[in-house]
């Protein structure tokens, strides 16, 4: 049933073309509830439009480290040179109301779904403000913090259980309700798993199923906007590579 499904998106990074493609896919599936795992801005050329879409759709969203960078809450020393340049550019163009929205976002959202503690966080929920990466082969002690834990940050989609990695890149998997899982939906706006399609995931609460979904979008248009706004060309080139 569509009512039992939620979409989880992450790491949009001001890529309007990718975000629109993903939101259209979600809409076509009839899914109404969307969670966003942060990093709405950074890297790309449409920060205002992306923030406004997330805000106007009433997505339940947490804040990411690039959002913190634009807010001046995170030192640029912690970003690579391309990320720092994009943050400085974003600070110049972002509207005050969109800054206020980013500033209102929490570090963690906790939900109760079918009696399960479900965590939504940009990075490791152990210390969310440290922005520690979690990967398929490195999950730290994350399973101490919830039953289903959704994180972004690495831009690599995967589903991991306490026993090890279960799913990478794309596909569906039924979860065992007696086990704990770490789920990364991948990145909408800058995938880094070698696949240049936007990535997000769908969680079916009724069937206890996860699907990682890949969506094609107009990469050329996103690239051209980056170049036009004199952002580092590599930020556009990497979109074609999925890196």
Curated annotation (Swiss-Prot):
Disulfide bridges in this chain: none
Designated name of the protein: Uncharacterized protein MJ0912
SUPFAM superfamilies: Metallo-dependent phosphatases (SSF56300)
Organism of origin: Methanocaldococcus jannaschii (strain ATCC 43067 / DSM 2661 / JAL-1 / JCM 10045 / NBRC 100440)
Segments passing through the bilayer: none
Coiled-coil zones: none
Single GO MF annotation: phosphatase activity
Gene Ontology annotations for the cellular component aspect, listed alphabetically: cytoplasm
